[in-house]
Amino acid sequence: MKYMLLIWNRPGFTEELSEQERTALFGEVDEIMKELTETGELIGGQALANPSQTLTVRQVDGNPEILDGPFMESKEQFAGYLAVDCDSPQRAAEIAARWPDVRYGGAMEVRPIMDEAGTEM
């Protein structure tokens, strides 16, 4: 089954870490990505730019309006995602639990990806 692992964290938290902690964090990410590539579970993933660079499009008075900034103000940001193909939701959650942002006050949301027909998996 395919899952989207949504990475949530606090903007700028890595700048609060020491250089050694930051290096270790990025090293863990590299290790997880390498492992998932080797096992064939990794479909893809990307980090997202800072929320200050976000544009939000909303319908206002029947017309689309482009606004600067994220959809809602929050202490956490949607920071990126991983798409994985693994045997179970438990395995997807195991992968998410290893993501280092979780230890620093972030969260990983595990969501099944719908199939091409638009039905729940």
Which residue ranges define each predicted feature?
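Conserved, structured core segments of small domains
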Residues: 1-121
